Amino acid sequence: SYEFSDCNENEYQTYVTDHSPQCILNDPLRPDTVSTPVSGNELLEAGEDCDCGAPANPCCDAATCKLRPGAQCAEGLCCDQCRFMKEGTICRMARGDDMDDYCNGISAGCPRNPFHA
């Protein structure tokens, strides 16, 4: 198994914090996933609302990969108990010269602050 050394991990964190490389920080788009949709592989693929991986996720029906009735989301920094967190809730704290990122109230993802350094 390959693991980062403490030194490499610190250098990587510094790079990500200082340069905000979008190719690393952005979630892949659903059409970018190349595999056939498979329930439980923990990848959100075309046609899936959620992919819980384990039947224990209360927001996702593991048999259909669809959100359970009343659920808005199954995972994400802005998803809490199957609901989108309120707009303005901090989902990623500022690092260095960067600014906090906030939930938008309409998605489970944590959008990057457009004014980040």
Curated annotation (Swiss-Prot):
Q: Which region is the signal sequence?
A: none
What assembly does the database describe for this protein?
Answer: Monomer.
Q: Motif Cell attachment site located where? A: 95-97
Where found in the cell? Answer: Secreted
Q: Which InterPro entries does its entry note?
A: Disintegrin_CS (IPR018358), Disintegrin_dom (IPR001762), Disintegrin_dom_sf (IPR036436), Peptidase_M12B (IPR001590)
Q: What EC class is this?
A: hydrolase
User: Which segments constitute the Disintegrin domain?
Assistant: 36-117
Annotated cofactor note: Binds 1 zinc ion per subunit.
Q: Which cysteines are joined by disulfide bonds?
A: C50-C65, C52-C60, C59-C82, C73-C79, C78-C103, C91-C110
Cofactors required: Zn(2+)
The UniProt record lists the keyword Zinc:
yes
Q: Which GO terms describe its biological process?
A: proteolysis
Q: What is its main location?
A: secreted
Q: What EC number(s) has UniProt assigned to this enzyme?
A: 3.4.24.-
Q: Which GO terms describe its cellular component?
A: extracellular region; plasma membrane
Q: In which tissues is this gene expressed?
A: Expressed by the venom gland.
- Report further notes: The disintegrin belongs to the medium disintegrin subfamily.
| Pfam name, any one | Disintegrin
- Provide the GO MF annotations for this entry: metal ion binding; metalloendopeptidase activity; toxin activity
Output this protein's name: Zinc metalloproteinase/disintegrin
Q: Which family does it belong to?
A: Belongs to the venom metalloproteinase (M12B) family. P-II subfamily. P-IIa sub-subfamily.
Keyword terms, alphabetized: Cell adhesion impairing toxin, Disulfide bond, Hemostasis impairing toxin, Hydrolase, Metal-binding, Metalloprotease, Platelet aggregation inhibiting toxin, Protease, Secreted, Toxin, Zinc, Zymogen
